[in-house]
């Protein structure tokens, strides 16, 4: 499933990393990404959503903070949230 760039998702002044984190969190919560699945890399997220790699990394770290994902050094972020 090809997602629209986050710039097309809303027109408010919410930072892009927050919008991307919300999008990913929604996809985790709706079952697009299930417990144990790997999230796209920051490079792939950056390209797909037309943001910088730093923005994508910040969004992924928000998912770690919220308990939706975990990250082990040199490995992709993994979904840990369960419905």
Placement of each model-derived feature along the sequence:
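Extreme N-terminal segment that seeds HTH/winged-HTH DNA-binding domains in transcriptional regulators
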Residues: 1-70, 75, 81-83
